[in-house]
């Protein structure tokens, strides 16, 4: 994958989002608050097809003012399994003045591994996109994805 082949994030007001995206956000909130509820039941409550829910559920995240004070997020990196790879990633994060909350490196399979990092960016003014781009340009990192943000 090309280092420039990544998704950029935007902050968008809810009133300009398509109805299906807004419904997806509401369904995610309902499912979060009531784990016993099935996806089928939740989408039925909001009159949304399951296919529309699945299309948007991993691409839309609620954000509010709390992100300014918290600045915690989790990334997953897809990397080649080479000696020193994790050290290179950690060095990059140190140079960006980020605090590492948790690290998990998967067992390498077929020369590939994933590194999941929970980070705290309160000590830097960098945006998440800047952090992701800095990690994308590290040799042997093929993909970087944002998987969660603490709000």
Curated annotation (Swiss-Prot):
Extent of the signal sequence: none
Domain ACT: 74-149
Coiled-coil ranges per UniProt: none
Database matches in InterPro entries: ACT-like_dom_sf (IPR045865), ACT_dom (IPR002912), UPF0735_ACT_dom-cont (IPR008310)
Disulfide bonds: none
Family: Belongs to the UPF0735 family.
Protein name stated in the entry: UPF0735 ACT domain-containing protein SSP1116
Species per Swiss-Prot/TrEMBL record: Staphylococcus saprophyticus subsp. saprophyticus (strain ATCC 15305 / DSM 20229 / NCIMB 8711 / NCTC 7292 / S-41)
